[in-house]
Amino acid sequence: MSLVSQNSRRRRGGRANARRNNGKGHPAAVPGPDVPRDRNDPKILQGLRASEGPGTSMLPTPREGPSASVPPTASEGSSAPRQFIISQGPNTSEMPTSRKGRGASRPPAVSAGLNTAMSITASEGPNSPVPPTAPKGSKAYEHLPVSEGLAISEQRHSDGGPNMEPTLGEGPGISVPPTFSEESGISDEGLSIFMSPNISEGPGINEPYSVSEDPSTSVPPTDSNGLGINLPPTFGEGLSISMLFSALEEPDIFAPPPSAEGLFASMSPPSGEIQSSWVSPIIMEGCNVNVPPTSKKGLRTSVPSAACESPSTSAEGLSSSLSSISAEGFCSSLAPCAAEGSCELLPCGEGRSTSELHCLGEGSSTSQMSLAAEGPSASGMPTEANNPEEALSCCASERRNKSTSRALQKAKDPSVRPKREDRFLDFQVLRDSKNSNSITIMGLGTSRVALTLKPQDPMEQNVAELLQFLLLKDQTKYPIKESDMREFIDKDYRHQFPEILRRAAVHLECIFRFELKELDTEEHIYILLNKLGPVPFEGLEDVPNGPKMGLLMMILGHILLNGNQAREADIWEMLWRFGVQRERRLSVFGNVKRLLSVEFVWQRYLDYRPLTDCVPVEYEFYWGPRSRAETTKMKILKFMAKIYNKDPMDWPALYNEALEEDADRVVVNNFRVARPFRRPLFAEVAPELDASGSKYSPHSWPESRLESKARKLVQLFLLMDSTKLPIPKKGILYYIGRECTKVFPDLLNRAARTLNHVYGTELVVLDPRNHSYTLYNRREMEDTEEIMDSPNRPGNNFLMQVLSFIFIMGNHARESAVWAFLRGLGVQNGRKHVITCRYLSQRYLDSLRVPDSDPVQYDFVWGPRARLETSKMKALRYVARIHRKEPEDWPEQYREAMEDEANRAEAGRRPLIVRNLR
């Protein structure tokens, strides 16, 4: 054999021997990248490292794909730390085993002198560890850092129990805590959960509970020899729950609340001889509860829980403790703390709430306290309404011995008083078992306060909700469907809808002056009609502000019944009896306090005067000048008689006073009628007050200039009428020009005539001393002679004119003809379609397709709402007044209107059923 062949054979044999002698992971001469080179290599102390990307906390080899790595085991007497290697791919792991042991699933045999230090990093990927449990006497130090900067550590120390520093152990065993994945919620933005391994007697493998993504679960293990445990808080944005170990022999347990963006609570259990593990209820928003645990014999665990979606508060503010006693005598101690010094109590709803203590077997016992909510509440861990996740606590001493027994247990002490150095304010809340609305709050070290909640009838609450919905819906003038009304009634009371609707109709009729009328019995559509009729001058008849005007009439009536004056406290007491509260912002009335003391006073409906001889200062309300101009005492007296179900003559003195006022008004009206028709409404300026500096003399202004200034003045009055505020003379001159001072009476006369004939309003002097003016609507016909879609803006009211035009044209008019009519009234081209569409949706108009029309055309006719709210005679009178004619000038329409009035009078004698009016 040649020398070359011998050398090549030797090289091949050497490589084969090297492959047989070495492991499968690396070549013979190249060590692994994660294998320590010598004893001083810092990688020995690094422990198990996580890869940069999303990886798994397993024990694989550095090659790709699933693989297994079995590091060498320690022999007897060796003192070598173990190292676990993690690769980048999805791998599986096997725990290190001893070559002399029974199998790969058992912990390695470690002799005396073996010190093991391990740290496990939790990555973002899924983990599948099978941690063994440590036997009795084993000692281990465990550190669990979390990737992305979030670290969680558990340091275990106890006087008589095992020390967690790496020391010499008496028996073989390694305790590896469970790893954490995304599902368990250990991340910067997820749910932060503490989980710890079970320390039991003897070697074995303990598998932790699987944690899903939805429920937040914490599993506290127990130790038979007792542990003193201190857990630092975690930091995250979500729900943070920390569960403590339970011990037997007086452990000193402290758990600070986690610092997350949520509400945190910790509760101390009542002191006793029994073993219990407490789970505190989740506190609602704005409350931070922290109570130090008491120290007596028995197992005591303080478990802080947190609720998310609320800023975290600290315990630096004012704190108090609440000792809640249930019907069975169970009591607890809470200390709510607010960051800004506010003190809050646990929210208690309507109904009874029970508190139960669930006792487990010999190992541990768990008690759960439920949060008081509306209706009967069962015991269990409560959750916040906005967070669907459930907090589940489970405490088990040994997996083989799981015995659960549930019993209702009462605490021995009535309350648990916190330490005085914490500056807690102690209270006791006593709830009457017979009357759930009666609550007594007694301070343990302060004065006693007794509170009795006002009983609320669920039926009345549903009536109030339906009433507000009807009033809001009526402002849009749209028909109200029964299905929409049922949505505002609680599901448990929808079967009593007829009774609730009847009560709401009574309130509408008595207080808000509306009648609930069924428009269509088949489709169950309702509308609101004016029932009590408008006031004489119609100033208070403002449909969009109808509820406010009804409230004003009630106040005016109360002032009238109390001798034309009433104190503010008496008015609030009267309103409270009708369900109107000062502090509550109603959706219909808005801010009631501002409405009374600001808006009605500014609008001169009320006068608000202080009483000088009262300390503190009190105020009295009187009728304002606008109220005296727009209504009468007789009208208000009849209104109050309907509310109190009486007759106006039941108040004889007030009735005689109202009759005298009506007689005076008749004399004044007759005196005005006797005057010339073209009489100036306002006096002319005296000649001696004329100034020669004007460009034109008072009687030498051109007619066009006077008409221009009068139109501008009309625009000002219409603009200010929506605010109901008085218009001073100075403001008028500032708007139209100060050069109009000399011709001011003439301009007022022109503007008053335009407002009276065109817009149906009258210009009056509200305050002669301050020269302030205002508008009010005077309807010369019957009470509801005209209907208006926008009463507060007369310039936008074209409903009565459109209805009259349709009636004059033969009860139907083409769409193009109606638009041409609106264009003649000054309506812009872009708005005519909007106006007619609104009238169609409000059922004032109906559209009928013209047969054989190409392109398609429609005719407008009166709708059902128009036939209910007005009549043909009223429309004919309206047209006659506009054209300065008499209704008889249209003989055909007048005869039809008279027949319609006869039919209405006959229908008024029998019950009216509105059905298919189209």
From Swiss-Prot:
Q: Which SMART domains does this entry report, sorted A to Z? A: MAGE
Q: Which GO terms describe its cellular component?
A: dendrite; nucleus; perinuclear region of cytoplasm; plasma membrane; postsynaptic membrane
The subcellular location is: Cytoplasm, Perinuclear region; Nucleus; Cell membrane
Region (Disordered): which ranges? 1-140, 154-227, 367-388
- Report the domain of life of the source organism: Eukaryota
Key words, A-Z? Cell membrane, Cytoplasm, Membrane, Nucleus, Repeat, Tumor antigen, Ubl conjugation pathway
Expression by tissue, per the entry, reads: Expressed in cell bodies and dendrites of hippocampal and Purkinje neurons. Also expressed in peripheral nerve, where it localizes to the perineurium and myelin (at protein level). Predominantly expressed in brain and at low levels in the heart, liver, kidney, spleen, testis, lung, thymus, placenta and skeletal muscle.
Give me the stretches of Polar residues compositional bias: 70-96, 113-126, 213-227
Basic residues: which segments have biased composition?
Answer: 8-23
Ranges for the region named Interaction with DTNA are 704-918
- Residue ranges constituting the MAGE domain according to the UniProt record: 459-658, 706-897
The UniProt entry lists the main location of this chain as: cytoplasm
Which residue ranges run through the membrane? none
- The keyword Cytoplasm is annotated on this UniProt entry: yes
- Record Pfam families: MAGE
Could you describe the subunit structure of this protein? Interacts with DTNA. Interacts with TRIM28.
PANTHER family, A to Z: MELANOMA-ASSOCIATED ANTIGEN E1, MELANOMA-ASSOCIATED ANTIGEN MAGE ANTIGEN
What does the record give as the function of this protein?
Answer: May enhance ubiquitin ligase activity of RING-type zinc finger-containing E3 ubiquitin-protein ligases. Proposed to act through recruitment and/or stabilization of the Ubl-conjugating enzyme (E2) at the E3:substrate complex.
Protein name listed in UniProt: Melanoma-associated antigen E1
